[in-house]
Amino acid sequence: MSDLFENVNKSAEEYDASQIQVLEGLEAVRKRPGMYIGSTSSSGLHHLVYEIVDNSIDEALAGFCTDIEVTIEKDNIIRVQDNGRGIPVDIQEQTGKSALEVVFTVLHAGGKFGGGGYKVSGGLHGVGASVVNALSEWLEVQVHKEGKIYQMRFARGAITQEITVVGETDRRGTTVRFKPDPEMFDDTVYSYDILHTRLQEQAFLNAGITIILTDEREDPPKTEKMCYEGGIKEYVSFINKNKTPIHPDVIYLSGQKDDAVAEIAIQYTDVYNESIVSFANDIHTPEGGMHETGFKAALTRVINAYGVKTNVIKGDDKVSGEDVREGITAVISVKLPEAQFEGQTKQKLGNAYIRTLVDGIVNEQLTEYFEEHPAAAKAILEKAMTANRAREAARKAKESVRRKTGLESGQMPDKLQDCNERDPSLCEIYIVEGDSAAGSAIQGRDSRFQAILAMWGKMLNVEKARADKIYGNDKLYPLIVALGAGIGDEFNIEKLRYHKIIIMADADIDGSHIRTLLLTFFFRYMRPLIEHGYVYSAVPPLYKLTRGKQQKVAYSDEERDKLSAEMRADNPNAKIDISRFKGLGEMDPHELWYTTMDPEKRSLRRITLNDAIRADQVFTILMGEDVEPRREWIEQNAKYVVNLDI
């Protein structure tokens, strides 16, 4: 690991039972698993792995672990092995039980609490191993420590094998194997990609740690070794791999005060949006917090000061925070004792002193960097000044949009057929491609809660456009006004007029293009819509099957064949009329209602954002200027395309 972290947060070499503190019992976990892991869906299933890996990361942060291996065995059994000191096996004074037993059977037991264990810990709630144990069909732990192998086994949280010495060893570390309990989870199949994303993130954030992910369900097994000596500098380069930097080097800033450490990596590219990713104790903080606030304030101050010093900025003609962040990619990682996470989803860092720490580091070290690298400083300042001029050019269009955003103004777009309901949580808006489909949708809808907005012509690709082109665009303007929440830094989800925003486009090239353009716009300028789960794509059926008065619709070739067989169950020779829907515009209002708009029958696909970094990269590839990465991406992913009318 880097020298910065080797000298910080090292506990005493002796990691024993005295450092394990017990706060409360484990009884409630199986009754209310969502309270401890968020949900029993896929995210909760994968959270089990993160909890065990976080224990190994804690050992790494303390300076005692360099290698972590995560394996998905057959039958979706998970194995996590590290070369840390090994969980203590001696008797824990508070309970009279071995520390190993306490860690796996008592909630909130671990070295994350109290003064003698880890000073910095990655676990958000610290629930850790005991919750994984409670929610597993079975769990087995082996500790290699002081020449012996200690083993315990559990079933749904209960001990089935007391701590036992099962052999001798010449290494140290902990190995945990567990099988998630199908009684607890909707699905127990692990996604290699989801685990890979999280583990790669951890490898970037902890420079020098080696994390190996293996999927033994594949034949041959799929393995990837992740180790990034450059840490978050490499993370920024990874994010920017399909973008064009305007200065060659990633800027790295770091510092510490007492037990708190901060490191920041920055690089500007020629894109028009910002990408700032922040972490506290290796936990992603998508809602930002004090570390981001300190970073943004200092960044704006330093760039303005450099502009004044070099006579590029004169008088009060300062650039704004929005200007200086155009095109920036930044990773901010802070590690601190007793991190306080705020907000409803606990995704915002609240420790006020971290703002001062990060502000001071950026103010001092970025100023120094600009002095030593005038070419990079000039390129960054020029980009901010260009953004400033574009922002000024966009101001009038922006004011026009702002004046017409509120419902009370009564100035809704001509293309909007609004609904009667005024409670946003009950309202939905269909964004419909073309006047023909919009006409059928308007006639077929339930006007009590369904609004229709027709889109026509070629939409603007916001990935290739600066803000001044977006605010006054005649295709985006009606959408911005209809939704009522503003865009960019001024977007306010509380003002959103509809909590279901449904893109309704054909399954052909043009429809897919419109969907992609809309999603690019939402991702870049209204991202909270996606983060809150308000954006959907309508899934119109491909086939209509008719037998006499009986009608059914199918969304795939497989479903068509299955329904056809079911409709002939009583008479194998019965005639089934199968017709293919050619497009939304060719459906009559009744067909459009019962296939695509009726809440009882329709199929909607919610647009989710599990991995913001990957999404950022994909939008850059698909919608950006560079053709070659797009060609490569299409070649790699073409095999996954089905049911596309060409």
Where would I find each of the regions flagged by the language model?
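GHKL-family ATPase ATP-binding module
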Residues: M1-D16, L26, Y50, D58-A60, ...
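Mature N-terminal segment immediately following signal peptide/propeptide cleavage
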Residues: S18-K31
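Conserved short strand/loop->alpha-helix "switch" segment adjacent to the catalytic nucleotide/phosphoryl-transfer site
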Residues: K31-Y50
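A short glycine-centered beta->alpha linker in the GHKL/HATPase_c
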Residues: G86-I91
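Short adenine-binding "F-helix/F-box" segment of the Bergerat
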Residues: Q92-E93, L100
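C-terminal interaction appendages of subunits in large macromolecular complexes
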Residues: R389-E408, D423-E428, G439-R445, K458, ...
